[in-house]
């Protein structure tokens, strides 16, 4: 599992460690790890052209000390000082002692084999200064390595207020930063490398599951399991206008780990034709039989409100998706009732956050994905799976997970229906709402990648089919 810590948490841990270590030890550890990554990227260090972009403070110092280490191995290292009056004097002295030189020629940015971005550290806010912003749009041929964080990206949120440097590799010290895992910041970070420097950190408020974490969470039938012990998921989806949504939601549910799927709705004939193993009914949700979780809303049309009422009247967890989200936004937060998992995209999130007047712009919410997911979770007292370029799962206490899988090809009709069904099935199989949403997003993203392996458009049905090979 990847864990990310806020700037405040990192600063506190650094302060505690520096109080126990000789002066300069912590920066030395960071610089050594940074230089080691750069050496691997260069392959041959001797004769390589390296440009250090050094801002003020410790971030620039890390870059300068790393540049000095590379210069000692024969690299031609030049430093472009973005804040000469506030440069880290120890780092600059070390670079010069190793044979590095200071340059004022920004054209070297485009010719270096490797560029170290040490302009702004994790405390930076509000975008880059004009001289640094010019570099963000300049052409370069070499590899850009960000020191702890690409300059221009907010470390805590991933927001990008203006110009930012787009890194090929980001070397993180001590822990990942939230802004490296969440778009838009994640799209500027490139490949992440973590360098341990000995920090003692509290539990992380933001994490990202990896393969082993998901494997440990997935339900595995025991020797005495039957379909009822494994859990039964109910799907209330589809309408005369959108019967395919029911078929796709059921397809996702069948791959989620529950022992059986019950369907309640007007698309019963289409569902049983495609999935004969499903138990179907056309009456109320209560008449469908006992379930351990409900999925309500995909393609529900005008009937989504009635279905939502029926699900909220019961005790089992409810996945609220699509048209049911629109109905929930109209009503506002619900107090009491069963556990909810909301699955909005940015447009639905905007409606859910509207408190009279105009809704917030979906584009603004997308640019602040972590903050948006947490606001929704707190407002509705529910786990929220905010879909998008980076899917974020948040719960009301502020803890969140970022999904590291997926592909832009998943932006296709019906993909969300498959995800909702998969999520409901994992809930019925016994996972907590937070774990079920996290695992569903992960598996859905992997299935999308597999389906799009040839780099061509995919359908939601293909995503559902590929869930079978990413269990």
Where are these regions (language model features)?
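Small-residue (G/A/S/T)-rich helix-start motifs and N-terminal tracts that mark the onset
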Residues: 1-79, 114, 167-169, 178-322, ...
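Nucleotide and nucleotide-moiety/phosphate-recognizing core
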Residues: 36-119, 127-147, 317
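Internal gly/pro-rich beta-alpha loop/helix module
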Residues: 113-114, 119-205
């Amino acid at each position: 599992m990847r864990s990310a810590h806020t700037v405040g948490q990192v600063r506190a841990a650094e302060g505690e460690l520096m109080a126990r270590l000789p002066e300069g030890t912590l920066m030395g550890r960071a610089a050594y790890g940074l230089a080691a990554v750069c050496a691997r990227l260069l392959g041959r260090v001797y004769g390589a052209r390296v440009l250090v972009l050094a801002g003020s403070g410790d971030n620039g110092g890390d870059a300068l000390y790393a540049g000095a280490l590379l210069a000692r191995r024969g690299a031609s290292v030049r430093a472009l000082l973005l804040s000469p009056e506030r440069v880290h004097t120890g780092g600059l002295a070390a670079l010069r002692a190793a044979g590095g030189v200071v340059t004022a020629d920004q054209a070297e940015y485009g010719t270096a084999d490797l560029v170290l971005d040490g302009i702004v550290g994790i405390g930076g806010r509000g975008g880059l200064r004009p001289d640094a912003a010019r570099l963000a749009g300049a052409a370069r041929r070499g590899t850009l390595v960000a020191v702890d964080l690409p300059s221009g990206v907010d470390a805590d949120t991933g927001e990008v207020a203006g110009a930012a440097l787009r890194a090929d590799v980001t070397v993180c010290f001590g822990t990942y930063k939230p802004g490296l895992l969440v778009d838009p910041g994640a799209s500027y970070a490139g490949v992440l490398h973590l360098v341990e420097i000995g920090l003692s950190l509290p539990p992380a408020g933001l994490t990202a599951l990896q393969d082993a974490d998901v494997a440990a969470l997935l339900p595995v039938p025991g020797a005495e399991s039957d379909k009822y012990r494994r859990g039964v998921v109910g799907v209330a989806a589809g309408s005369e206008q959108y019967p395919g949504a029911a078929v796709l939601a059921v397809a996702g549910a069948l791959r989620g780990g529950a022992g059986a799927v019950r369907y309640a709705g007007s698309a019963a004939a289409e569902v049983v034709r495609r999935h004969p193993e499903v138990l179907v009914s056309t009456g109320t949700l209560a008449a469908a039989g006992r379930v351990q979780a409900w999925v309500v809303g995909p393609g529900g049309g005008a009937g989504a409100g009635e279905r939502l009422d029926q699900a909220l009247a019961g005790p089992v967890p409810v996945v609220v998706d699509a048209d049911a989200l629109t109905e929930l936004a109209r009503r506002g937060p619900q107090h009491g009732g069963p556990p909810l998992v909301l699955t909005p995209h940015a447009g639905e999130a905007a409606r859910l956050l509207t408190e009279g007047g105009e809704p917030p712009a979906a584009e603004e919410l997308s640019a602040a994905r972590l903050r948006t997911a947490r606001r929704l979770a707190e407002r509705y007292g529910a786990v929220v799976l905010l879909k998008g370029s980076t899917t974020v799962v948040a719960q009301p206490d502020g803890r969140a997970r970022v999904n590291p899988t997926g592909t832009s090809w998943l932006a296709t009709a019906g993909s969300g229906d498959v995800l909702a069904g998969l999520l409901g099935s994992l809930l019925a199989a016994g996972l907590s709402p937070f774990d079920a949403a996290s695992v569903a997003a992960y598996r859905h993203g992997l299935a999308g990648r597999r389906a799009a392996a040839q780099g061509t458009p995919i359908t939601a049905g293909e995503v559902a089919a590929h869930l079978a090979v990413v269990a």
